[in-house]
Amino acid sequence: MLGKGKIAALGFQHVLAMYAGAVIVPLLIGGALGFNGEEMTYLVSIDIFMCGIATLLQLTVNRFFGIGLPVVLGCAVQAIAPIILIGQDMGIGAIYGSIIVSGLFVLLIAPFFSKVVRFFPPVVTGSVVTVIGLTLIPVAINNLAGGEGAKDFGSMYNLGLGFGTLLLIILVYRFGQGFSKAIAVLIGLVGGSLFAALYKGISLGPVSEASWFHMPKPFYFGTPTFEWPAIITMILIALVSMVESTGVYFALSDISERKLTQKDLTRGYRAEGLAIMLGGVFNTFPYTAYSQNVGLVQLSGIKTRKVIYAAAGFLIVLGLIPKIGAVTTIIPTPVLGGAMVAMFGMVVAQGIKMLGKVNFTSQENLLIIACAVGVGLGVTVVPDLFNAFPSFVRLFTSNGIVAGSVTAITLNIIFNMIPHRKDKKVADPEPQHAK
């Protein structure tokens, strides 16, 4: 029987394991969209708060939602690039309108997703995640050099600070042990910021101006707007997140020695959809199950939900204290850029890892990957490629992630799902789901 002190300590460890990943999402998005200090403070604080709420939704089991596993929810990293692109092209309102609709979509398809999931084998999800990561790299390099439009863009100081942060992250990964490796990005951000503070100084104005307590405000950034290209993009991201969450659910069920049923998965997907909708209402981001916390459950051997309840409680309390959120907003742009290179590179690596499950003896699978990545990157590099087409077509070709996703899904159906006259080939293994 775990005492309250041990439960609190184990819960806080889960917070530390996911904190860097959770905080980096609002930092990168807010930085790319030019948010001021006050807006960034709110964005980080409400994000931490909503991570706690989203986690509670999964822990609490009732007829309608909650999978009841020791799962922690955090911001979906794969949503960073699409959100930045939507914000730059259509405005902040379109971001949150599309997030709300995508959450509603997840809620509605929850009972059917275990059947739909076969349309998203590794050849599709791996291609999509790879394209997402590749489209993020230019954002990272721009920030590493000082940020778009910076007067000292590309200066020796900015490049040294950015690459120095990246080097520190690499060294922690190389020589760190256990938990230190799990927070290598956080260590890099702290180390780079300390160097910048000692060398040039950092303004602590946002921290001193931030209040000690605040309450979350619905639609803080204004009324949401609903743009079809943005909505389609976020629905595709939600589907990819659901596939990834399914893997996390089954991993935790295996660790917990609990067999998942169709109803369990439906409640889990509903909780995720509700969390995404609330994220849109309170102006945060889509949520998904965090795999890094699965590793902690495995390493600690502690499978009780009490620990995750404690983690959710810590997240909610931290999110109500803006001064804590404000500390993360004073990180210099080149430091963020250095961390972005590692983070976004890891998104690419995750996509390649997912593609490792693909049957590469099939020429059809190679063609699916080639076309999906090629079309996705092509539209990213030349965004005006389809401007001459009707608006309906441009809904699916407005950005590289949507174009790459549609290409991968369509070609997978053609090559791997429609029966062929020739001998049956070995296709990808379908994502595991409950019978």
Task: Describe every region a protein language model picked out.
Residues 2-9, 30-39, 55-65, 85-94, ...:
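Short juxtamembrane and helix-loop transition motifs at transmembrane-helix boundaries
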Residues 5-18, 22, 154-166, 184, ...:
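Hydrophobic, membrane-embedded alpha-helices of multi-pass small-molecule transporters
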Residues 11-28, 72-79:
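The first (N-terminal) embedded transmembrane alpha-helix
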Residues 38, 46-47, 56-115:
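Membrane helical hairpin/interfacial module
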Residues 86-203, 312, 317-425:
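Membrane-embedded alpha-helical modules
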